[in-house]
Swiss-Prot record:
Keywords: Aminoacyl-tRNA synthetase, ATP-binding, Cytoplasm, Ligase, Metal-binding, Nucleotide-binding, Protein biosynthesis, Zinc. L-isoleucyl-5'-AMP binds at E551. Belongs to the class-I aminoacyl-tRNA synthetase family. IleS type 1 subfamily. This is Isoleucine--tRNA ligase. It is found in: Cytoplasm. It comes from Mycoplasmopsis pulmonis (strain UAB CTIP) (Mycoplasma pulmonis). GO terms for biological process: isoleucyl-tRNA aminoacylation. It comes from the Bacteria. GO terms for cellular component: cytosol.
């Protein structure tokens, strides 16, 4: 019995040290350390130092707790941009930052020290808060580095840094002396749970159950339209504010009805009469008279709670007939419209709510109650006086403190404000120059700025940058630049703690001491801190505006907003040229993540289990302009996509071990020329997608190309790669294409999967090889020639027809695979007849005839290359090609 000869050693089998198993969790740590040891980030900056800049400015995450999946999405997107721009040759330094002041850290310290803010010295609290914030920053820094960021995080910025704080005070000073910052009494968002004012960006809306009460105020001084003892019908969802009532607003041109029921006359807007009567359950009523709102002006009534005082009817521009009664109860310190109208009409301003939400002595018998707890007691009080027309509870969207998640109120207090109205035209003009993605980004920002009148920047807390204001002996604000400059110098030297550590005289220049001045105790809003980064952050060789701000969609009312206000105020221009936003990260079912639901996906767990490159590929695959989903199954799907890319890279590397690109001097022919043109088109499309920040399209274009490549070109190439002579023309043309494809693939994936790209690059016998793939240059776009694609369409149409027929024969078990087939083709095409169709279609035998036909090929299988040949062509059991190859 003859032994079968083993021809394996005569074949050109793939060889590479690039492993099939990625081992990302192990390799990522190794490569990260190598990059840090070799100072790769600094080498990239040095290489591009004199080139055009592209700077992504990092919006500072809050230094509290581990990073979550939203942080990972954000930082990876930024890193992809920075890496891509660096490969393009841009000088693209990335300086990460942290937001380090604010209530969450302050509350954390109070909780750990088991005290409230009144039981601890401010200086001690601040020292502990700083220590905590710095520790949290270090934790997050390590977690960010594990995302395989390009930056080495050596150069960072912190809002608690004394240099940053000093620059923030310089901004405050400029805005103050430009008349943009002022102190005033005004109702603002007030959080009883935080005992501080809030800015709009710190307010979130959740469903909340509130009381709805219809009551009436008895007229004590009428006119020709209404009489004493007639009743003004009022609707409110904040009964606790009735304590502070001092007026009722009507619409000047709204028609009102005097309607009689239950032996009394009631005043209500005519358009709301039927609805109100239906709510009250009143079926029989009589309209006694109708008149305009202007006819009610000056009418006096008995106040609902402080019954010994009277209120007055005034004109209200905000009164509508959408709901309620058309008469609006006014408590001037508990609503913006109430405040403005109250000032115009000199209405009493009553503040009966303490900082913590409890009622003070102004609340008479309700003193000591929490404001919301007083609602039911006030209802009972009104019922005793027969003043409750209707009462119920209803659920509606209501503002909450974004940190404590507790309801907030409008409350008039002395606060420091930025006047947006004064600077609004300049901001809107700058917004017109900004490019935004998605396309609605700029309009959204402009709308939010247009709708802002003021920005409350003072906070009644301890952990933050102080408002550097002194008051003289008459309690007047001191307007002296020299005083400001002296404080700024002290902060630059000692940090903002100096404001709390030193006495007033110690903070003042010598000529201002001993004047019995006092200092402001409020601190600045953290959004003023983070909004100051275009002033406070210095990057070598970089000036405002930065090229890109990239943050979550919530930052249109947050960082995007505060940054452009502060930058226009200080620099006179926008801090960014391009605005990019991403959505929120939801679970696999599209639900918001929460610990209660148990659907939180931890980026650290993904990295530990699969590797950062997998997490980064998931990010690149997301259509991030919208909300995105992540789950175990989505990550596993990403792993599969990753494997396909990795396997193709491994195949390319394995078959280039004997190829020297510098020695290639052949002209591409046939299918090889077509593949080269296809690569040009793919590179063009990928470059366009990268430049459009469409990373999903980058991955889609690359994977589609590699998939098509594997299913056709690489499949038909295996025969030549493995079985041809090493230096055969066919083999070298294939390797030329494979080299170019691999070279392009590695720079394409480098911004997205930096570890995998570097791992493959280490194993790539590349011409003019750099120390790292990340020091390579991104290819430039060239337009492909579509003439070849049109020419070759005829072949691919034929291929589809042939394979359709072959599949039928395989299903009928007449043949096992394509090279078992003898295919007869009906064609008169010179192009098709000029091709090596047997090779291109991987068919056993090709004939030309009158119709397309597939038959079994009565053949001999070459034991070396496994191709099927005519029995008459066998030479010592081999096909002629294999015989010549091993005997040459």
């Amino acid at each position: 019995m003859n032994e079968k000869k083993d021809y394996k050693d005569t074949l050109n089998m793939p060889q590479t040290n690039f492993e099939m198993q990625a081992g990302l969790t192990r390799k990522e740590a190794q490569f990260r350390q190598r990059w840090l040891d070799n100072k790769l980030y600094h080498k990239i900056l040095a290489k591009n130092k004199n080139n055009k800049q592209f700077v992504v400015h990092d919006g500072p995450p809050y230094a509290n707790g581990s990073i979550h999946i939203g942080h990972a999405l954000n930082k990876i997107l930024k890193d992809i941009v920075v890496r891509f721009k660096s490969l393009q040759g841009f000088y693209s330094p990335f300086v990460p930052g942290w937001d380090t002041h604010g209530l969450p850290i302050e509350n954390k310290m109070l909780s750990e020290l088991k005290v409230n803010h009144k039981q601890i010295e401010v200086v001690k609290l601040r020292k502990e808060a700083a220590k905590y914030a710095l520790n949290q920053m270090l934790i997050q820094k390590e977690q960010f580095l594990k995302l395989q960021m390009l930056s080495d995080f050596e150069e960072i910025y912190l809002t608690l840094d004394k240099n940053f704080e000093a620059k923030q005070l310089k901004l405050f000073k400029k805005m103050f002396f430009d008349g943009l910052i002022y102190k005033g009494l005004k109702p603002v968002y007030w959080s009883p749970s935080s005992m501080s004012a809030l800015a709009e960006a710190e307010v979130e809306y959740y469903d909340h159950v509130s009381p709805s009460i219809y009551t009436c105020f008895t007229i004590t001084k009428g006119n020709e339209f209404v009489e004493v003892d007639d009743e003004l019908l009022i609707w409110t969802t904040t009964p606790w504010t009735l304590i502070a009532n001092s007026g009722v607003a009507v619409g000047l041109d709204i028609e009102y009805s005097k309607v009689k029921f239950n032996k009394k006359n009631y005043i209500v807007a005519s358009d709301l009469l039927e609805k109100v009567m239906e709510i009250f359950g009143v079926q029989k009523y009589k309209v006694v008279d109708t008149f305009k709102g202007k006819n009610l002006l000056g009418v006096e009534y008995q106040r609902p709670i402080k019954t010994d005082l009277f209120g007055i009817v005034v004109a209200g521009y905000h009164v509508s007939i959408d709901a309620g009664t058309g008469l609006v109860h006014m408590a001037p310190l508990f609503g913006e419209d109430d405040f403005i109208i109250g000032q115009e009409n000199e209405l009493d301003q009553i503040m009966h709510i303490n900082d913590d939400g409890s009622i003070n002595s102004e609340g008479d018998e309700f003193q000591g109650l929490f404001y919301s707890s007083a609602n039911i007691k006030i209802k009972e009080f009104l019922e005793k006086n027969d003043k409750v027309m209707f009462f119920e509870y209803f659920t509606h969207s209501y503002p909450h403190d974004w940190r404590t998640k507790k309801p907030i109120i409008f409350r008039g207090t002395p606060q420091w404000f930025v006047s947006i109205d004064k600077i609004k035209p300049a901001i809107l003009k700058e917004i017109e120059k900004i490019e935004g993605r998605p396309s609605w980004a700029v309009k959204r920002l402009a709308t939010m700025i247009e709708n802002r009148k003021t920005w409350t920047i003072s906070r009644q807390r301890s952990w933050g940058v102080p408002i550097p204001i002194f008051y003289n002996e008459k309690n007047e604000i001191v307007n002296d630049e020299k005083v400001f400059d002296h404080v700024i110098e002290l902060v630059e030297k000692y940090g903002s703690d100096v404001w709390f550590e030193k006495s007033v005289d110690e903070l003042l220049p010598s000529e201002y001491k001993n004047k019995n001045w006092t200092k402001e105790t409020n601190i600045m809003d953290v959004w003023f801190d983070s909004g100051s980064t275009s002033i406070g952050v210095e990057i070598e060789g970089v000036s405002v505006p930065f090229d890109l701000y990239l943050e979550g969609i919530d930052q249109y009312r947050g960082w995007f907003n505060s940054s452009i206000i502060n930058s226009v105020a200080y620099w006179g221009q926008s801090p960014y040229r391009l605005l990019l936003s991403h959505g929120f990260v939801l679970d696999g079912k599209g639900k918001k993540m929460s610990k209660q639901l148990g659907n939180v996906v931890d980026p650290q767990e993904i990295i530990q289990k699969y590797g950062a490159d997998i997490l980064r590929l998931w990010v690149a695959n997301c259509e991030y302009a919208h909300d995105v989903s992540v789950s175990e199954s989505i990550i596993k799907q990403t792993v599969e996509n990753y494997r396909k890319i990795r396997n193709t890279i491994k195949f390319l590397l394995g078959n280039l071990q004997d190829y020297d690109h510098s020695k290639f001097n052949l002209k591409l022919e046939g299918i090889h020329e077509l593949i080269n043109e296809r690569l040009k088109k793919v590179k063009f499309d990928i470059l366009q997608a990268y430049n459009d920040y469409d990373f999903n399209d980058v991955i889609k274009t690359l994977t589609n190309f590699l998939t098509d490549l594997s299913s056709f070109y690489l499949s038909i190439s295996k025969d030549s790669l493995y079985a041809d002579k090493i230096n055969s023309k066919e083999r070298r043309m294939i390797q030329y294409n494979m080299y170019n494809i691999l070279e392009a693939t590695l720079v394409v994936i480098a911004p997205i999967m930096p570890t995998t790209a570097e791992d493959a690059y280490d194993n790539f016998n590349k011409q003019d090889k750099q120390e790292s793939v990340h020091l390579e240059k991104m290819f430039e776009a060239t337009i492909a020639d579509d003439k070849l694609e049109k020419t070759w369409k005829e072949f691919f149409d034929l291929k589809d027809e042939v394979y359709k027929e072959i599949e039928v024969e395989i299903a009928n078990k007449k043949i096992k695979r394509t090279n078992d087939a003898h295919v007869t083709i009906n064609t008169k095409s010179n192009f098709l007849m000029s091709l090596d169709l047997k090779k291109l279609l991987m068919i056993g035998k090709i004939s030309f005839g009158s119709s397309l036909r597939v038959e079994t090929f009565d053949s001999h299988k070459c034991p070396r290359c496994w191709n099927h040949i005519e029995k008459t062509e066998v030479v010592e059991d081999l096909c002629q090609r294999c015989y010549q190859t091993i005997n040459s």
